[in-house]
């Protein structure tokens, strides 16, 4: 039974039914199935994010590090730009006075701009929670829709595949702090449109729709789109190698429409892309070093799952938000079984090849097993410095293996339950349970965030800020971005020196770095916070402090009591030549 092969990249036509009543019944059944799938996916997403939803006022996803603070700031700044009719692509509310190129910072304008009213009314934490919930549930439903329509699989098998795509270990991991890698529901839509054009021919409607969807995905996340495009390209090549008779009809149907859709997408996002690469505070490339998966990451269970709780493996993850693989060995074994079982099906072969290819790429330049370097070079070594992929984290290519594995399971599940042999459905159901139950996600850990000092939340800061900036001690940076939240709670009413973003580290090569270009005073204050000791302040350091405050356009310097407070306060006193005053929970130096 290999008829499912004909529905993946060659969707068959269906004759209209002459029985209106039967058709209406079928539509109602389909709608109920779709509604049930959407409801189930939404409930699972709410379960995963329950801690955040229960505490929208002060809850913070523990494993996000400083990323949640950064993303909430992105949402708040977009809403501020919309409300004040300002250019959302650049903001000087961080990194004053140079500002931040937000198009070069994955600010997700495709989401942050439409949700600006919600951000303005309820705050960026609500927008953050909506984005993650919508991302998980929407991505699961979009893949379910694709599998049930384009592949032609049963609703049950399609729901299984959609759930795997929407709640895969990598999705749950990124839900801690990377909504741009969670809101992926447009990717299956792109697949559906491309497949429809290739199979049934182009129309103006399809071409325009594809261009619009690609443009919107660019404004949601370019890196996931690039990874997806590479993986889909691998799938298509392998598929047509196995089904060469379908290649020429697909080429004839697509050769005009796909380029036109690409041109339309580029025209729509031409200015934002120009701003990203050539606008103020743009950068040439972001060097991230070796970021490949340890081979054990492919076979172990994810930390935030039932399997990870009861059978944790060696800690080989990059960080809590980058568990991009962690498929678990049972799922890999089941995927292999499905690939062998369906080997005569061209789409199954293509899915298997795609999963293997992107899985190998995700391992990086050198094979690492259990943190041991084997010195065995892998394909990423040869492509890591090529244009477009040079700034991609190679570990994230593992995310593209998920839809491929899901397709294998969808096709195999559909075949198992249509086979007619009674032992097969039962055996396959047991195998699915063994592979997928350990991957069931656990709720993301949520903690209380440190309250915003009353100095900012009460509006007292207005008595100390004219047209200049607020300099916090230490300055906001990737290691501690809490001042971004203070700024949000103050209504985005003042700019901050420093910040957490990606910007150029120099004006020549424009190599990117996280955070602001380090000025002498910022480095000094960071060092004092870490050491807890007061250095001997020199005249040069005092001169540097005056120059830095002038560069930052500082009106007030603010220190919240915490780690190394005494040392930091004494250091700033000596740098400025006068003491601080304590007011509304903070130490302040008025430097106007």
Regions found by a protein language model. Give the residues of each.
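Hydrophobic, aromatic-rich transmembrane alpha-helices
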Residues: 237, 327-362, 414-415
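Extracytoplasmic
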Residues: 2, 433-592
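Start-transfer (signal-anchor) and selected internal transmembrane alpha helices
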Residues: 1-54, 256-263, 340, 346-354
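Hydrophobic alpha-helical membrane-interfacial segments at the cytosolic entry of transmembrane helices
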Residues: 34-43, 212-213, 236, 248-274, ...
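Membrane-interface coil-to-helix junctions
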Residues: 44-139, 168-184, 295-315, 369-381
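Membrane-embedded helix bundles of polyisoprenyl
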Residues: 41, 132-150, 155-241, 258-269, ...
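Membrane-helix boundary/interfacial segments in multi-pass membrane proteins
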Residues: 61, 174-181, 294, 315-319, ...
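Periplasmic/ER-lumenal interhelical loops and adjacent helix-loop junctions
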Residues: 66-81, 254-257, 261-339, 388-398
């Amino acid at each position: 039974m290999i008829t499912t092969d004909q529905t993946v990249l060659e969707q068959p036509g269906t004759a209209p039914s002459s029985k209106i009543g039967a058709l209406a019944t079928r539509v109602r059944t389909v709608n109920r199935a779709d509604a049930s799938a959407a409801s189930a996916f939404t409930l699972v997403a709410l379960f995963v994010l329950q801690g955040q939803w229960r505490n929208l006022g002060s809850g913070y996803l523990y494993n996000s590090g400083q990323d949640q603070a950064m993303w909430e700031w992105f949402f708040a700044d977009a809403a501020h730009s919309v409300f004040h009719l300002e250019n959302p692509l650049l903001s000087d509310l961080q990194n004053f006075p140079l500002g931040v190129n937000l198009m070069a910072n994955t600010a997700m304008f495709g989401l942050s701009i439409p949700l600006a009213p919600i951000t303005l009314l309820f705050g960026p934490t609500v927008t953050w929670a909506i984005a993650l919930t919508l991302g998980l549930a929407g991505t699961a439903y979009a893949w379910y829709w694709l599998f049930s329509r384009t592949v032609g699989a049963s609703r049950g098998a399609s729901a299984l595949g959609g759930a795997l795509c929407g709640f895969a270990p990598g999705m749950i991991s990124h839900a801690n702090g990377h909504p741009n890698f969670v809101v992926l529901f447009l990717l299956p839509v792109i697949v559906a449109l491309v497949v429809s054009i290739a199979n049934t021919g182009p129309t103006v409607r399809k071409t325009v729709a594809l261009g619009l969807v690609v443009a919107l995905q660019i404004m949601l996340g370019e890196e996931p789109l690039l990874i997806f495009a590479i993986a889909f390209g691998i799938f298509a090549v392998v598929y047509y190698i196995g089904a060469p008779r379908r290649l020429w009809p697909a080429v004839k149907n697509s050769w005009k429409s796909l380029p036109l859709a690409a041109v339309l997408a580029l025209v729509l996002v031409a200015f934002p892309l120009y701003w990203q690469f050539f606008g103020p505070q743009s950068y040439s490339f972001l060097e991230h070093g070796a970021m490949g998966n340890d081979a054990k990451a492919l076979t172990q269970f994810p930390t935030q799952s039932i399997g990870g709780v009861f059978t944790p493996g060696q800690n080989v993850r990059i960080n809590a938000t980058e568990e991009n693989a962690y498929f678990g060995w049972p799922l890999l074994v089941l995927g292999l079984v499905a690939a062998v079982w369906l080997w005569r099906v061209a789409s199954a072969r293509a899915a298997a090849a795609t999963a293997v290819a992107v899985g190998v790429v995700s391992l990086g330049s050198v094979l690492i097993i259990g943190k041991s370097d084997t010195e065995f070079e892998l394909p990423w070594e040869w492509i890591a410095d090529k244009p477009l992929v040079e700034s991609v984290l190679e570990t994230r290519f593992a995310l593209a293996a998920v839809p491929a594995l899901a397709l294998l399971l969808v096709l195999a599940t559909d075949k198992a339950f249509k086979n007619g042999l009674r032992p097969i459905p039962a055996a396959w159901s047991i195998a699915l349970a063994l592979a997928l139950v350990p991957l069931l996600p656990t709720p993301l850990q949520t903690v209380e965030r440190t309250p915003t000092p009353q100095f900012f939340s009460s509006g007292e800061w207005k008595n100390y800020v004219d047209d200049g900036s607020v300099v916090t001690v230490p300055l906001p940076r990737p290691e501690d971005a809490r001042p971004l939240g203070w700024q949000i709670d103050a209504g985005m009413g003042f700019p901050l020196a420093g910040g957490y973003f990606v910007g150029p580290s120099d004006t020549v090569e424009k190599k990117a770095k996280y955070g602001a270009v380090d000025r002498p005073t910022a480095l000094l204050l960071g060092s004092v916070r870490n050491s807890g000791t007061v250095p001997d302040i020199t005249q040069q350091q005092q001169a540097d402090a005056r120059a830095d405050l002038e560069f930052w356009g500082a009106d007030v310097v603010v220190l919240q009591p915490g780690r190394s407070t005494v040392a930091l306060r004494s250091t700033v006193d000596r740098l400025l030549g006068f003491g601080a005053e304590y007011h509304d929970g903070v130490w302040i130096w008025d430097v106007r």
